[in-house]
Amino acid sequence: MPKYPFVEEEFETVRTIIRERASISRYGDGELRCAIDGSCSSQKGDPKLAEKLRRILKNDIKGLLVGIPRSVERYDWAMYNSKKAGSWVKYRTHRFGSLLDPSKKYYSSFITRSDNAFHINCKQYWDLCKVMWDKRNVVFIQGEEKPIAKTKDLFGNISSSKIIIGPSHHAFDEYEKIKNEAKKHYEKNVLFILALGAAATVLACDIHLDGYQALDLGHMGAFYGNIFKEKPGLEKIEKEAISNDQIYNKELYK
């Protein structure tokens, strides 16, 4: 079995993003399946997507963190969801291990998943997360069905926000449209927060290469809302899917 590389823990992953104003591309089980020419529930297989995902896993791009699952052998799984341990072991086999650079330092993809990392289920952790976007002009790029931006308390400390709505399923099919829409918002102090499945993993890298910070934070809003029982705090939004060649941009908070 290939040697599993070092993966930084969740608190330190967030601290690194804050300290270095780094971007992050994250891999969960769906992205890993897509990287080996497979598919997942939200994204059908695509050779171009698979190639991009594989390349990012071994990249040496300054300021871009790559998040992967933590090893079930290297770390104390009392802090994690042991029910999923078998799943990560499967991806450590020849199907997945060969995609990684054993000498590269990786970061945790569990930073948004308190169902995987039980110890981040605390106010201290979520307060730390809020520092990542404190007083920033945020552009959310998200799917229509599970909008990360709906958790108003989580993002209540940002300066301004706009939203780009993409497809909740098979978003990579509309990748160029989504990326071109993101480029319209390139400006000083902008931060992109992405929740768009496997498409977000590669989009975070592309936005970073253009010189802007991008955080792939899918599932974060849902788990924060579950923990703090937050109800959606936004007014009703009329959304148009990007697949219909219409993008919806709106100030969410003032």
Segments and roles (model prediction):
Residues 145-189:
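A mid-sequence, solvent-exposed acidic-amphipathic segment
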